[in-house]
Amino acid sequence: MKSLFSILMLFVVIISCKSDKSENPTEVKKELTIAEKIANAHGYENWKNVEEVQFTFAVDRDTIKGNGRSWTWLPKKDSVYMQTGLQNIKYSRKNLDSVPKNADRAFINDKYWAFVPFQLVWDTSATISEVKKGKAPISETEMDMITILYPSEGGYTPGDAYDIYFDNNYMIKEWTFRKGNSETPSLSTTFENYEDYNGIKIARDHKKDNGSWNLNLTGIKVKTKIKVF
């Protein structure tokens, strides 16, 4: 009798284990999109820790140094502070009614150069193509590429397209901007001199093919609520 009771108890335990397994099926890991892979390669997973970003956007031509625009951005509050020449503007992007349009347009432009890998994830209204092979515009090296195309209405860049070339590690190396999705390139530059700022990787220099034109980002600071090693 004791033996029969033990067998019955063992049977109950086995059934219980099987029931638990069926109630907790193995979680299927979601495949990342190409936008997420590129963003993560540049440190997007650390963006949640970012409290403040500072940088200066300038364009140097030959020996002429650009004056630049300096920005402080608090992304969690979406507050922006701009300094350029004698102009100082502080505003919230949650209320743009009283903000000069040229100031916010400049911020969106300059932020795009600094954080285009993340814009691929942030800009949900844009269309991103499938990955294909293409010849990079500056190095003429064959790389993987995608095109991000913006809607024809709304925003500061309606209908514009960007061809983005990246390496095997999903790091952006070059791009081409095509205004209004024109077949003719409007601007092509490199993405080089990457630095890591508390886990966020930013390309500091963007040069044309002749090397005498350089759109650069300086004075970069990324402040986080926790230290990223």
Where are these regions (language model features)?
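A general structural signal for short secondary-structure boundary/capping elements
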Residues: K65, W73, V99-D104, F118-T127, ...
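Bacterial signal peptide processing site
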Residues: K18-D20
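Gly/Pro-enriched, hydrophobic low-complexity segments
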Residues: E142-F229
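Flexible, processing/modification-adjacent segments and terminal tails
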Residues: K90-D160, S182
